[in-house]
Amino acid sequence: MNISNQYAKLLSESVRRWTSIKAAAIISEYNPFHNGHKYHIEQTRAKGATHIVAVMSGNYVQRCEPAHIDKRLRAKMALVSGVDLVVELPLPWATASAERFAKGAVQIINAIPAVELLSFGSESGDVERLSKAADVLFDEEVEQE
């Protein structure tokens, strides 16, 4: 097999692998990591995510509080529980208001081309109600622009 055929085969295999990736992102603090977080990761995988990226706050979390557990240990817990990549949310966003926290995390997620899904948990579990609330918030944001 000549070089161009080897290159074509490698390119073809790479494209096939990339098109089969269905990566999901989770915005997290894992402060501390608990069974509910593990369940969320398991459910994200069960819903078809082939890869999971967690955007996680570092040693300081929302409200400028120090994290209960070191960021490296929290990242390791996430990796052992099924997350494939942990990306640290920079301090200015990690310690900001909920809106800025989320906005910073989403900006990071949008910079990762393979991520197609945002996986999140909720206390209500009512997807329709959450979707309607998101629509209202989106409409208000558009009107303000």
In which residue ranges do the predicted regions lie?
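Nucleotidyltransferase catalytic core that binds NTPs
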Residues: M1-E145
